[in-house]
């Protein structure tokens, strides 16, 4: 769960994370409700609406950076962007998928890129898991 410094400075309960009832959240649009992070928000907010819903991860990052609210974001990206982690283990692990169209799976160029990405993820596995 991440927020920007500007959001934290104006949040209703600056020193209490036990209660998120008055906080603003950036959530997912209807089409992304299958995501673990969307389901966590649904359970946490108990029917309360998000301040903003988006359909892309990049929009969520931009909204958090702008101080609009908090969002469930991947650690390995959010930390590089200078966002502040409020809760590091909320049980929303998301797999990383590499998808290649079946017609292109045997193309030498695509295979080289796919192999490189697989090696990179394997090499950075621990860092991708860490909060």
Label each PLM-derived region with a short phrase.
Residues 2-96, 123-131:
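C-terminal regulatory
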Residues 89-127:
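A late-sequence structural motif
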